[in-house]
UniProtKB/Swiss-Prot annotation:
Identification of the protein by name: UPF0200 protein Mthe_1012
An annotated Gene Ontology molecular function: ATP binding
Cross-referenced Pfam families: AAA_17 (PF13207)
Sorted UniProt keywords: ATP-binding, Nucleotide-binding
Residues annotated to bind ATP: 8-15
Organism: Methanothrix thermoacetophila (strain DSM 6194 / JCM 14653 / NBRC 101360 / PT)
Family: Belongs to the UPF0200 family.
Length: 182
């Protein structure tokens, strides 16, 4: 199994990068979808606070790599898979341990651009409780508390998303083509 992981702070462009992978015919697994599905299963509203709580509980009860393990359940070992949203060093280590080839890419976007993008995308769990800037700071702090900094430090490559959407999509496409050939 070849795993290409995307790591980056909220609003950095991981979903756009994953869309490019899908367009290229690469299977994409979104780690946040595991948390959102578990929150739905528990009957919780789709808020950032609830998703954070569920993520915390899964990591506490099933181990730091719980979400990583869940997101690969039932996938073929022959596939190339993009994993969107790696958030900790434990998740990085899990993917390294199960993949024949593992590539970790940091998606970096300056904070002010992330804030604008989050405000524009309108996802239900982005902000339901007041000032978006404060909400993003809280979310960043929570994700850094999960070990996001360690995961970012483990990335072998950084793609800067400080350009137009088309330019960013092209940067992602070129990197994915290269990694799928290696």
């Amino acid at each position: 199994m070849r795993i290409i992981g995307f790591v980056g702070m909220p609003g950095s462009g991981k979903s756009v990068a994953s869309d490019v992978a899908r367009e290229m015919g690469i299977r994409v697994v979104v780690m946040g979808d595991v948390v959102r599905a578990e929150a739905r299963r528990r009957g919780l509203e789709p808020t950032d606070a609830n998703h954070g709580m569920v993520g915390d509980e899964l990591r506490r009860s099933e181990g730091e790599d719980a979400i990583a393990r869940r997101c690969l359940e039932g996938l073929s070992r022959d596939e190339t898979i993009v994993v969107d949203g790696i958030r900790s060093g434990a998740e990085v280590e899990y993917f390294r341990s199960v993949a024949d080839r593992f590539h970790l890419i940091e998606i970096f976007t300056p904070p002010e651009q992330r804030l604008r993008r989050i405000a524009a995308r309108g996802r239900s769990d982005d902000n339901n409780c007041g000032d978006l800037s404060e909400a993003l700071e809280r979310r960043d702090a929570r994700e850094l508390g999960w070990g996001m900094g360690e995961a970012i430090a483990a990335a072998g490559m950084r793609i800067c998303n400080d350009c137009t959407l088309d330019e960013f999509r092209e940067r992602i496409r070129v990197v994915l083509e290269e990694l799928c050939r290696s």
